[in-house]
Structure formats: structure tokens, C-alpha cells
């Protein structure tokens, strides 16, 4: 964690950070903020399917103590006007969002919102960006390919984990990779190096011939509704009746797939617009890099260092739409 902070030169001194207390590898976020010198760290801890708020706070505090930050984090059950107004950086994290029109109205004008992911991954349900624009609240995504972050370097390993979990051996397996976004080379190259026979396409509507596939790895940009239609799944089922659909990114109509006779992995559907496998599935390092990168984006936005320092500007991605 310290190495990741030092790589990015993350310095939150004098700033109040409102973020989440979470489970799994996402436990690191408020601890990282404290380690980076934030003057105050507010962490929303909520009871959910992963554990109680009390358990989450206790686990986070144990990690904070191990990192020399015991007692630095304030755990809160929910956001409120007073605490949001005190925050300089409000992270777009699970227990904090949705960041609604009302919540944006509570923020002080100089507050900023790091999206905590790349800007093209933006989900409109996360942040009311129209309210942000009206209020002058700055927001931006993280450049996950920045040399000090390099989260994309883990995408191929994550895809391999998803394939292995589904029982697909990768080596000499025929895999149709559906990808229409910057993930493509980071998934494709490592799988090929593992011996997979990859056919890549931007969508299932492309002419992919009549070859049979062992698996269809779906890594499509989320949109309203499913990223692969019932007709497209029917075409796959005709030529690859035993193929498994792997939901890496992008929503899948699982009822339609079942009616067609195609299996979908993972067994439990992710939330709409979310990845089918978390980075924590391959260990904490990728998550640490991602969260430090998101906090760094928040720092750059708040200090407006992107205006005068091209190196600082490389950490953020403006939301264009």
C-alpha cells in the first residue's frame, strides 16, 4: 500500500475525504486515504450481503492499525448534509453512491468527485453529472493505464481466472472474445500467450464465420439493456451448442440465454453495469492500484494541478459525454 502511494505521489494532506468502508480488497480505500495524509477520513459503513456495518468497520480499523493509522478513520452509517459539506473529495464508491442531485447540492463549491474508474466506464446511475455541472463540482475518471497505476495489466489475469472458474482450460480452447473497448489488447494478448485460440470481434453481430467455440468471453461496454441480443445468442448456439457465455463486462439476458440453452458464468449475475468478476479475485494488488489511482485523480482535481502540470493531468480522464 505504501509503495502504491509513493508511486503516484499521493498527498492528501489538509483534505477531508468522504469514501466507503467496504469488505474484501476494497477495505483498503479509507486506510489509503489516511496513509496519504488526509486530515480527516469519513468512511460510510453499511450492512449488506457481505457483512454487517460493525464487522466492516472493525476489519477496516484492524487494517488501519496495522498500517499505523489506528483511530484516524471515522465510520458513519450514511451520508448527511453536514458531513458531505465538509468533504473536499467525495469518492464514487459503492457505499457513497448514488451521488444524487440533493447530495451534490450539499457539497461546497470546491469539492470534487473522482469516479474511481475510467471515464468511458461511467454509469449514469452513479453520479448526477448534470447537477455537478450546474454547481461547478469537478469530476473525472482515472487513467488506469498510467505507468504508476497500470490496472489494465491485470485484465488478462482476471479473464483467465473467470475462464478457469467456469471450467474452461484456456490452452488450445477456442474462445470468441467480444470486446468493443480499450480492454481488448489487455485481455487478448495474455490469453493468446496461454495458448488460447482467440477470435476477437467488436460485437456478436460481426461475421465470425461458422466455427465452433468452447467459450464466448463478453467484455462489452455496458449500455441500457443486454450487450448481446437473443438473436446473436441463437447464432452462437447453432454453431457452438456447448459454449459457455462468460460475463466479464456488460449485461447479459440470462433468461434468454437459458431459453436458448446457453450456460452463463458466473452463476450469480453482477449488478447492472458492473463487472462479472471483481479484481479482488486475483488478490489485493490490482485493487490497491485502482483505489490509489482514484484518490490521486481526486487530489489532482481538488488542487487543480492539471492546469499547470502536464504530468499531473495524466492521472485523470475527463468525462466527455
Predicted stretch roles:
Residues 35, 39-66:
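Glycine-rich phosphate-binding loop and adjoining beta1-alpha1-beta2 segment
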Residues 35-41, 193-202:
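Conserved S-adenosyl-L-methionine
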Residues 85-168, 246, 250-258:
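Phosphate/diphosphate ligand-binding glycine-rich loop within oxidoreductases
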Residues 20-43:
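Histidine-anchored nucleotide/phosphate-binding helix
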Residues 79-105, 203-281:
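Rossmann-like adenosine-cofactor binding region
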Residues 64-82, 195-212:
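A short, well-structured beta->alpha microelement
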Amino acid at each position: 500500500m505504501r509503495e502504491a502511494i509513493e508511486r503516484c505521489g499521493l498527498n492528501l494532506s489538509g483534505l477531508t475525504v468522504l469514501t466507503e468502508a467496504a469488505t474484501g480488497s476494497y477495505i483498503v480505500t479509507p486506510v489509503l486515504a489516511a496513509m496519504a495524509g488526509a486530515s480527516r477520513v469519513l468512511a460510510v459503513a453499511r450492512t449488506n450481503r457481505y457483512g454487517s456495518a460493525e464487522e466492516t468497520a472493525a476489519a477496516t480499523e484492524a487494517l488501519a492499525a496495522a498500517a499505523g493509522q489506528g483511530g484516524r478513520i471515522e465510520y458513519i452509517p450514511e451520508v448527511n448534509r453536514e458531513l458531505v459539506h465538509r468533504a473536499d473529495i467525495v469518492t464514487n464508491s459503492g457505499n457513497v453512491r448514488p451521488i444524487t442531485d440533493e447530495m451534490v447540492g450539499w457539497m461546497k463549491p470546491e469539492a470534487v468527485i473522482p469516479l474511481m474508474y475510467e471515464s468511458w466506464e461511467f454509469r449514469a446511475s452513479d453520479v448526477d453529472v448534470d447537477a455537478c455541472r450546474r454547481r461547478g463540482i469537478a469530476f473525472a475518471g482515472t487513467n488506469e493505464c498510467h505507468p504508476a497505476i497500470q490496472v489494465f495489466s491485470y485484465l488478462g489475469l482476471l479473464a483467465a481466472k473467470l475462464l478457469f472458474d467456469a471450467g474452461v482450460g484456456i490452452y488450445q480452447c477456442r474462445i470468441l472474445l467480444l470486446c468493443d473497448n480499450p480492454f481488448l489488447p489487455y485481455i487478448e494478448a495474455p490469453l493468446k500467450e496461454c495458448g488460447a485460440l482467440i477470435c476477437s470481434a467488436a460485437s456478436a453481430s460481426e461475421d465470425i464465420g461458422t466455427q465452433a467455440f468452447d467459450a464466448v468471453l463478453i467484455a462489452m461496454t455496458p449500455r441500457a439493456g443486454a450487450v448481446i441480443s437473443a438473436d446473436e445468442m441463437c447464432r452462437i448456439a447453432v454453431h457452438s451448442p456447448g459454449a459457455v457465455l462468460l460475463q466479464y463486462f456488460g449485461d447479459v439476458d440470462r433468461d434468454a440465454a437459458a431459453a436458448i440453452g446457453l450456460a452463463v458464468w458466473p452463476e450469480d449475475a453482477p449488478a447492472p453495469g458492473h463487472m462479472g468478476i471483481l479484481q479482488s479475485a486475483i488478490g489485493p494488488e490490482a485493487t490497491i492500484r485502482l483505489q490509489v489511482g482514484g484518490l490521486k485523480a481526486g487530489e489532482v482535481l481538488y488542487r487543480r494541478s492539471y492546469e499547470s502540470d502536464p504530468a499531473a493531468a495524466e492521472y485523470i480522464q475527463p468525462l466527455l459525454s
